[in-house]
């Protein structure tokens, strides 16, 4: 948004620098084609709302898409009211009413003429809308009767042309209608009267219904293109309205280009209707009217049914304007129009004042551009993004209560006792204390502490294991001999040494047989194996040092 606002004043300043002639309506060389035609058609549609009568609204509903003629000419209706028409007169009247509604220009004059045995002028030539409405009302009330003498109708039309259009001021268009075959003398008289009308500048069209002869009506008309034959009766006459209106109408609808350049040669293309009514192409004239005294006529270079190409007059000054008229009969009559052409300078400035304002504003424009170039572009901070709300963390469900621990496995059963050589301490004297110990671990200090001093005279024996063939020995027993209070002479073989008394090496110690008589052991004691015998040769206790943790023997026990 900031960049658009910055360039806005400069853009407005640039528009002010544009030369003023570019904004003028006539500065552009070409306008859209047919713009005046659309304007005139719009005016014609508004004028159509002012018509009255029982058939006008119905006609407008049915013929809104049809051609609306805006030319300037005289239109004559010559209608058959002979007895052969009979009850079809109302259909004939509706056809006339719808055709009249297509000619909306106030410059078009109309005349209603009927014929049978004699001719009758129902509506003299007029452009008054009220008189045309009254003429339609009188036409509707007519009762058909008499013979079919078309020449009587042409005589009445020639009288109107000579009275109201002396000097061939405007073109005359005649629409002659019949419903049957003409007798021979009536046909010949009609041909003569039609030729008189052409000499007066009239164009003759014929519309034939029911029992007509095609060669008769073609001879009466200007050409086969001017003939409208209806095969399906009077009600089908309304199908010819559009085609008839486009051919009968003489008007100029638009011109290209509407604006030309001063001093340059050019051609104008004139668009309109009724160009097929020309008798000879060399009789067509394009007239350019500047004013009452300045008129230029040119011959067209090409013509078709709806347009013609004419060389335009040279224009010397900007702003000059001329109107266009066309003649199809070598200048006898011209049909007028409101189409005009205007000259312009086409962008060439003849006045130096046009440059004054741009020269004054040019420094301001340069200053504005210089400031824009020097201005530092300020980068806008990026928009602050709003922190998105973190979704609330769902509280985890409480853990399930711990399952009770599985029951402990039952303790393994104690190993079965091994029947090996146990260690047996035999008390030979009356020791007050333990008389026997099994499974002594460690050193012999414990054994000496448990023995009574009075039992020290008993020699101990060490039994060698049966499966290992080793003797229990202590390292300190080989180095020193200390006399313990309760130790007999105990010894170990020097070759069999062990740092400690293993748990799996039990033995049997019991007194020597030299000093003490063996006593019978209780029955609960285990039996001594036969290989556990012998006397220790070396004393044990004298060589063992006292352990710091060993207790002195209790002599009172």
Swiss-Prot record:
Residues annotated to bind a divalent metal cation: 82, 84, 148
Side of membrane Extracellular, spans: 26-345
Residue ranges, compositional bias (Polar residues): 534-557
Domain VWFA stretches: 74-244
InterPro entries for the chain: Anthrax_toxin_rcpt_extracel, VWF_A, vWFA_dom_sf
Localization (cell): Membrane
Positions of region (Disordered): 380-411, 497-557
Pfam families xrefs: Anth_Ig (PF05587), VWA (PF00092)
TM stretches of this protein: 346-366
All ranges on the Cytoplasmic side of the membrane: 367-557
GO molecular function: metal ion binding; transmembrane signaling receptor activity
Membrane topology: Single-pass type I membrane protein
Homology family: Belongs to the ATR family.
Name recorded for this polypeptide: Anthrax toxin receptor-like
Source organism of the structure: Macaca fascicularis
Gene: ANTXRL
């Amino acid at each position: 948004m900031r960049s658009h606002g910055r360039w806005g004043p400069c853009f407005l300043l640039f528009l002010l620098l544009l030369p003023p002639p570019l904004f003028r309506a006539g500065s552009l060389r070409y306008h859209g084609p047919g713009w005046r035609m659309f304007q005139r058609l719009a005016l014609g549609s508004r004028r159509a709302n002012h018509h009255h009568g029982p058939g006008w609204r119905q006609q407008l509903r049915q013929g809104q898409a049809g051609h609306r003629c805006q030319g300037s000419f005289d239109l004559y209706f010559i209608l058959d009211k002979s007895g052969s028409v009979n009850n079809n007169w109302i259909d004939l009247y509706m056809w006339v009413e719808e055709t009249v509604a297509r000619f909306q220009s106030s410059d078009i004059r109309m005349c209603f003429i009927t014929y049978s045995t004699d001719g009758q002028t129902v509506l003299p030539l007029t452009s008054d809308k009220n008189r045309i409405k009254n003429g339609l009302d009188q036409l509707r009330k007519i009762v058909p009767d008499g013979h079919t003498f078309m020449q009587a109708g042409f005589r009445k039309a020639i009288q109107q042309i000579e009275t109201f259009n002396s000097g061939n001021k405007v073109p005359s268009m005649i629409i002659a209608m019949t419903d049957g075959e003409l007798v021979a003398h009536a046909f010949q008289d009609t041909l003569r009267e039609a030729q008189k009308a052409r000499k007066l500048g009239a164009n003759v069209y014929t519309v034939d219904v029911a029992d007509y002869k095609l060669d008769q009506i073609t001879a009466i008309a200007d050409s086969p293109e001017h003939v409208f034959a209806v095969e399906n009766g009077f009600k089908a006459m309304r199908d010819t309205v559009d085609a008839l209106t486009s051919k009968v109408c003489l008007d100029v609808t638009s011109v290209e280009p509407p604006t030309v350049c001063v001093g340059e040669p050019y051609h104008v293309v004139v668009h309109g209707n009724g160009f097929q009514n020309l008798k000879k192409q060399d009789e067509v004239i394009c007239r350019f009217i500047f004013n009452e005294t300045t008129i230029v006529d040119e011959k067209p270079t090409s013509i078709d049914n709806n347009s013609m190409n004419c060389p335009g007059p040279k224009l010397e000054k900007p702003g000059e304007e001329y109107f266009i008229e066309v003649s199809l009969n070598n200048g006898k009559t011209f049909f007028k129009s409101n189409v005009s052409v205007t000259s312009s300078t086409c962008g060439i400035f003849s006045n130096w004042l046009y440059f004054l304002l741009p020269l004054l504003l040019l420094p301001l424009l340069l200053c504005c551009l210089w400031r824009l170039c020097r201005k530092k572009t300020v980068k806008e901070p990026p928009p602050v993004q709003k922190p998105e709300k973190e979704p609330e963390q769902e509280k985890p469900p409480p853990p399930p209560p711990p399952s009770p621990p599985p029951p402990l496995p039952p303790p393994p059963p104690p190993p079965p006792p091994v029947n090996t050589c146990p260690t047996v301490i035999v008390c030979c004297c009356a020791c007050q204390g333990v008389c026997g110990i099994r499974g002594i671990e460690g050193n012999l200090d414990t054994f000496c502490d448990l023995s009574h001093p009075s039992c020290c005279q008993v020699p101990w024996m060490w039994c060698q294991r049966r499966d290992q063939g080793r003797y229990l020995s202590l390292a300190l027993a080989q180095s020193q001999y200390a006399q313990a209070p309760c130790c007999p002479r105990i010894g170990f073989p020097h070759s069999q040494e062990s740092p400690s008394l293993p748990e799996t090496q039990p033995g049997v110690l019991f007194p020597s047989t030299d000093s003490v008589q063996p006593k019978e052991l209780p029955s609960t004691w285990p039996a001594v194996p036969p290989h556990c015998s012998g006397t220790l040769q070396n004393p044990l206790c004298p060589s063992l040092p006292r352990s710091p943790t060993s207790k002195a023997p209790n002599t009172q026990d």
